[in-house]
Swiss-Prot record:
Example of a GO biological process term: mismatch repair
Protein name: DNA mismatch repair protein MutS
Gene (UniProt): mutS
Binding site for ATP: G665, P666, N667, M668, A669, G670, K671, S672
Known role: This protein is involved in the repair of mismatches in DNA. It is possible that it carries out the mismatch recognition step. This protein has a weak ATPase activity.
Family affiliation: Belongs to the DNA mismatch repair MutS family.
GO MF: ATP binding; ATP-dependent DNA damage sensor activity; damaged DNA binding; mismatched DNA binding
Length: 849
């Protein structure tokens, strides 16, 4: 169980008397530091000094230990030496990464001028510095601090009058969502969204139930006063950010949703120090459009990680065949929120079917996609003012590949590369296209919709291609990333920089011709700069030569032309870098004009990546297209567990589930695997993926519930049995007639009669009240009697064979009731000594008698 990391728990003792420190005799630099630190008490302050970011006082003590760097001292304050440590500015991101992962917030203080510029303001003036940004777990945008295929959400939860809202955004991609929720659903929402940082009011955590929920997650918690979430303030923040008068023009918001969204935007404004990010209009997440997977099911089904916290062995590790970062992120969103609309699901399936049938098209598209960088995140950095030449170059490459992809899709639509998939379209799937000024007809295939959403970025690509050199430069201050031919002034400066020696030599030759002195030289030193030198025996009479210095054996001169050339050479680099920075800023403005269409194209690329990835998965793993409709069917022929079958020989099993299937059989026979595989097949189908089976017909499922395995929840103070009862209570209280429930044992943590009574009552309730599809595995053979009076309960068992005193598990699910649980045999497999096994057999026979 992971603990919450509260950012405000770090106390800065040195700042308790901050103002008295400032009044003490400190150096101007230390006074500047202390004044800035007083504004960011709950942050580690990275204070720029030359080529290093320095940390002082308690910050230094903490950082040195956490980052494993040397703790030293610098000067004195209040008669005590000041602890100090530092990290090189050029490699600071790796240190930031570690601190952010530990839940710290870091305030970045940069130099706003050079030392020479500071001296112009006065001899004793120090370099101006200020905090330029605040880096927190939920607001990072740097590639080196992010995982390519994982979202990095900042979320906010607000409660007012027992109404709850949660809003979440990702600064690195511009995604922004909000939804109404409830205290009961909050746990599931947090697990689905998986935010890195959560913004809440100080009052919010006074509720014991809230604290109990939050303890289950490794989330950086940022607390603010209730006024930070105030309605009128949040409403104003939203309107000002999107430059609108009424919020109704961008969506429907409840009062509490406005408070959650507005607080997020205000927090972004504070942390970004005035830089305006690119954020989409907040989209309403409507739970009724998606399958709800309860908290227990998300964990037990190992969708994203195993019970040991590893990605390998999870469902995502098997099904992720995406080749783009944005496709990988969208796949995780789809797995977290499968669809609950048959038409929308079939829209996805039809496109995947097309790529299953058309190998060459699938291969070509995946080849192009694999060479497309993460333009979504590069775009966000460029708009926020933190983009690098590398980001601009990646955007250029991405737009070029998008044009190539668009041309290939034109061939598909013209029939050159196969027939278009069945024409489905769902209006909610294409709303973003409408906002970007793209008209999408209601009778178009999804592939056509994706094609149109890619847009035409030829003009912008050609502009960037003519301006940007291929590079991996992380800072515009380095220069050397703009084509010299793009700008005539830059071309001249580049010529000077690249040919300075040639220009000096050319001028020297012209002076030799003018004076007739073959031994004339042009030399350079730090005192005179460039100068003309001749021996003392030669006399120069031309008026263009200005005497500079007389030596015993030589005479030195300069000329206006030489001074001008020297000035050009000395200033060319600074001028070139300054000009490149100006051009870069202009290019960023051009990118900003197209940002909405670029973001739409990035989303279309992600969708296309997933559809082709699903096709690749289906072909490689022998998956079949499921039939999805609005019936209540659950008929799977020869279904397989998508994860287990990858590494082991797998026995397929069928199921035709119309009510409740009660499954008996020994441990290790495969009951739990059978339960999980059917839930996973249902989830895959609702994502729009093919499934591991010979055939599958599934009526839309609104919710999936799981009670499979149980452990103590020590942090909440719950025993194994209590956890089991809470999970079961969730099922009987929330399951509908369109839900799928899988239960693996109920009542094991109490007395036999108690457990049996509870299990039977649950089955009867699910049958008579919930009326949902359910698979119930049990060791209580007495439960099978319910099939005699509950018409929709059928009994199944796992087939076993006894041979020469041994029990062989065949892993086949057949109709019927298991004779025994074979627990003693499993104990033998586990390595019990013979004496214990023999005694267990004796006791077993006595109990049977």
């Amino acid at each position: 169980m992971c603990n919450i990391i509260y950012n405000n728990v770090y106390q800065y003792n040195i700042l308790k008397n901050i103002m008295s420190f400032v009044k003490e005799k400190n150096t101007p630099v230390m006074e500047q530091y202390l004044n800035l630190k007083a504004q960011y008490k709950d942050h580690l302050l990275f204070y720029r000094l030359g080529d290093f970011y320095e940390l002082f006082f308690d910050d230094a003590i903490k950082a040195a230990k956490l980052l494993n760097i040397v703790l030293t001292k610098r000067g004195n304050s209040c008669g005590q030496e000041i602890p100090m440590c530092g990290v090189p500015a050029h490699s600071s991101e790796s240190y930031l990464h570690k601190l952010i992962d530990l839940g710290f917030k870091v305030a970045i203080c940069d130099q706003l001028e050079t030392a020479d510029e500071a001296k112009k303001r006065g001899y004793k003036s120090i370099v101006k510095r200020d905090v330029v940004r605040v880096v927190t777990p939920g607001t990072i945008i740097e590639d080196s601090l992010l995982e390519d295929k994982s979202n990095n959400y900042l979320a906010s939860i607000v409660e007012q009058n027992d109404e709850y809202a949660i809003s979440w955004l990702e600064l690195s991609t511009g995604k922004f969502f909000h939804t109404l929720t409830s205290l009961k659903a909050l746990d599931s929402d947090l697990l689905r969204i998986s935010p890195r940082e959560l913004l809440i009011s100080e009052k919010f955590t006074e509720d014991e139930k809230i604290r109990s929920i939050l303890k289950n997650y490794k989330i950086s918690i940022t607390q603010h006063a209730q006024s930070f979430f105030e309605y009128s303030k949040s409403h104003r923040t939203l309107c000002e950010f999107y430059k609108i008068r009424e919020l109704g023009s961008i969506g429907n918001f409840s009062k509490v949703e406005i408070m959650a969204c507005g607080a997020l935007l205000e927090y972004v404004r504070v942390t970004q120090r005035g830089s305006i990010p690119r954020l989409e209009f907040p989209k309403t997440y409507k739970q009724q459009n998606f399958m709800l997977i309860d908290t227990s099911a998300r964990r037990n089904l190992e969708l994203f990680s195993t019970q040991f916290g590893e990605k390998k062995g999870s469902l995502i590790s098997v099904i992720d065949h995406t080749v783009t970062a944005s496709g990988g992120r969208l796949l995780k969103q789809m797995l977290a929120s499968p669809l609950a609309c048959s038409k929308a699901i079939n829209l996805r399936l039809s496109t995947a079917q097309f790529f299953v049938n058309n190998h060459d098209s699938r291969r070509k598209i995946r080849e192009i996609l694999s060479n497309i960088p993460d333009i979504e995140r590069s775009l966000s950095r460029l708009i926020l003012g933190r983009g690098s030449p590398k980001d601009m170059n990646l955007l250029k490459i991405g737009l070029g590949k998008t044009l190539e992809l668009s041309e290939f899709l034109c061939k598909i639509e013209s029939g050159e590369n196969g027939s278009l998939p069945q024409q489905y379209v769902i209006q909610t799937e294409i709303q973003p296209a409408s906002r970007a000024g793209i008209t999408v007809k209601s009778d178009e295939s999804e592939l056509s919709t994706i094609h149109k959403s890619l847009g035409n970025h030829k003009d912008l690509f050609e502009l960037l291609n003519s301006a940007i050199l291929d590079n991996n430069l992380s800072s515009v201050k380095e220069g050397g990333f703009i084509h010299s031919k793009y700008n005539s002034e830059l071309s001249e400066l580049s010529y000077i920089l690249n040919n300075s020696n040639k220009l000096v030599t050319k001028l020297r030759e012209s002076y030799r011709d003018l004076t007739g002195i073959a031994a004339l030289k042009i030399l350079h030193n730090n005192i005179l700069g460039y100068y003309v030198e001749v021996s003392a025996n030669h006399k120069i009479t031309s008026d263009i030569f200005i005497h500079r210095q007389s030596l015993a054996n030589s005479m030195r001169y300069t000329t206006n032309e030489l001074k001008e050339l020297e000035n050009k050479i000395l200033t060319a680099r600074d001028a070139a870098i300054g000009l490149e920075m100006k051009i870069f800023s202009e290019l960023c403005s051009e990118v900003a004009k197209e940002s909405e269409k670029i973001a739409l194209a990035a989303n279309a690329l992600a969708k296309l990546d997933i559809r082709t990835a699903f096709a690749e998965l289906a072909v490689q793993n022998n998956y079949v297209k499921p039939i999805i409709d609005d019936s209540k069917e659950f008929n799977i022929c020869s279904g397989r567990h998508p994860v287990v079958e990858v590494n082991d020989k797998f026995i397929a099993n069928s199921i035709n589930l119309a009510g409740i299937h009660l499954i008996t059989g020994p441990n290790m026979a495969g009951k739990s695997t059978f339960l999980r595989q059917n839930a996973l097949i249902a989830i895959l189908a609702h994502m729009g993926s093919f499934v591991p089976a010979e055939s599958a017909h599934i009526g839309v499922i609104d919710k999936i519930f799981s009670r499979v395995g149980a452990t103590d929840n020590i942090t909440a103070g719950y025993s194994t049995f209590m956890v089991e009862m809470i999970e079961t209570a969730t099922i009987v209280n929330q399951a509908t007639d369109r839900s799928l429930v899988i239960l693996d044992e109920i009542g094991r943590g109490t007395g036999v009669y108690d457990g049996l009574s509870i299990a039977q009552a649950v089955i009867e309730h699910i049958h008579n009240v919930n009326k949902c599809r359910a698979i119930f595995a049990t060791h209580y053979h007495e439960l099978t009697k319910v099939s005699k009076y509950l018409k929709n309960v059928k009994c199944f068992c796992v087939k076993i064979r006894e041979w020469n005193g041994e029990v062989i598990f065949l892993h086949e699910v057949i109709e019927g009731i298991a004779d025994e649980s074979y627990g003693i045999h499993v104990a033998k497999l586990a390595g019990f000594p013979d004496s214990v096994l023999n005694r267990a057999s004796e006791v077993f026979e006595e109990l049977k008698a």
